[in-house]
């Protein structure tokens, strides 16, 4: 096979009509690297046309060599087809992505990504840990404090209270803290959404929301070079900083993990910022260990 040399990528544009070809590219990269280079919600945004893409077309628009994806103000996400690498394509795409978005994700922080970041004078500014543990979880004995009960989320009733507490709990978080009613509605419309796995700690009496644990089930992916079974996730675990009650996170975490085990899942995962020491300690107490590091890189001269 003769590999065409890297050229200049086309202009940034929305590409819902090219989503299938880009999905094939992303899947091939994930199979080769053992880690998905583009996150699920960004792939959804490519399909819907909400994201902007910069495509290295390679020899044919139907068989792209690489892509950079920009969504809102978030760090860009970039990948190159496994058989088109070491030709300067990644360098061109990452340079353009950082110029547009100011930063780029490196999922898995693989050695090739580290080397490219160093060559482009990019430095790590954020580390998002993926942690995992086996299920079921042994009973830990966490009980709701006096005056608190646990119930599940009720669509049509709890959205506004959840958004208020979520905004306070994640006020400094670059993604979760800006979730609004529209974004929540989009999440609730997804096939994976299940209110039976969305747990709320509320006052009793009063039913005032204090904390929440939203779980998620990822379906099995048996095909490809890196097949996986279904996975359960601590999707979002948040406590209202104004609640003033200790132990709510532990109670809700255990309840959610028990639910995921009852669904027949044998592995739970979560994502947590590496510098969120209290959360990391909680998850370590629950038996989670680091499975993967995801890093945001920015130019060395950028704050």
From Swiss-Prot:
Residues that bind 1D-myo-inositol 2-(L-cysteinylamino)-2-deoxy-alpha-D-glucopyranoside: 175, 216, 233, 271
The organism's place on the tree of life at top rank: Bacteria
Recorded catalytic activity of this chain's protein: 1D-myo-inositol 2-(L-cysteinylamino)-2-deoxy-alpha-D-glucopyranoside + acetyl-CoA = mycothiol + CoA + H(+)
GO biological process, one term: mycothiol biosynthetic process
EC number: 2.3.1.189
GO MF: mycothiol synthase activity; protein-N-terminal-alanine acetyltransferase activity
Xref: InterPro entries: Acyl_CoA_acyltransferase, GNAT_dom, MshD_Acetyltransferase, Mycothiol_AcTrfase
Keywords recorded for this protein, A-Z: Acyltransferase, Repeat, Transferase
Domain N-acetyltransferase: start-end pairs: 148-303
Binding site for acetyl-CoA 1: 78-80
Presence of keyword Repeat: yes
Enzyme class: transferase
UniProt KW Acyltransferase keyword: yes
Family under the similarity heading: Belongs to the acetyltransferase family. MshD subfamily.
Function: Catalyzes the transfer of acetyl from acetyl-CoA to desacetylmycothiol (Cys-GlcN-Ins) to form mycothiol.
Subunit structure: Monomer.
Name this protein carries in UniProt: Mycothiol acetyltransferase
Record organism: Nakamurella multipartita (strain ATCC 700099 / DSM 44233 / CIP 104796 / JCM 9543 / NBRC 105858 / Y-104) (Microsphaera multipartita)
Gene: mshD
